[in-house]
Amino acid sequence: MTQIPTPRTFQEAYFGEAPWDIGRIQNAFAAVADQVKSPVLDAGCGTGDMALYFAAKGLQVVGIDYLEEPIRRARAKAAERNLNVDFRVGDATKLADLTERFNTVLDSGLFHVFTDDDRRKYVAGLAQALNRGGRVFLMCFSNEEPGQFGPRRITRDELKNSFALGWQIESIEPNRFETNPKFTGATFSEGGPKTWFVTVQRQAT
């Protein structure tokens, strides 16, 4: 049922078929690839497919995830493909601690896992990690997705409120998550869970 997931929830998911681990970049992010500017931070990178996609295009990419197992898998993929991505175990609520600054942050399914307090920390960290004029592209579960399984559903107003100060919201558009076809733990909407795909820019002044 809908809840704030714990680290153990994600650890257990990687023992089986994690619904979000589709083995490639989500199509919604591939569609905006020409807008993604280096250097890039993939926040909540999982097993690394999106970070590796952009590294293959020649971009400088850092990927962080809270758990060691997906980072281990991501590093193995990078080695197999001879791609250079800086994969790290890290806490996305502490992005201000990073020494680098980025022109793009990518978030595929991270925003919706936070408590209200951690979400505020995350957004504040995004502002610190991004260069002025940099963009965040994020996709999260929408309140239009029925049922109780999975992460919190996020409303359009919650997104607007989260990025009200110091940000320019460029778009909030309905979209869909693609899911791992081997995952059988729940049923989502036909065509994939309903989402919001969001583009926000850190204000230059």
Regions found by a protein language model. Give the residues of each.
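Class I (Rossmann-like) S-adenosyl-L-methionine-dependent methyltransferase catalytic domain
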Residues: M1-L41, T47-E100, F114-A129, G134-T205
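A conserved beta-strand element that flanks and buttresses the S-adenosyl-L-methionine
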Residues: L106
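Short catalytic micro-motifs in class I SAM-dependent methyltransferases
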Residues: G109-V113
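Conserved acidic residues
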Residues: N103
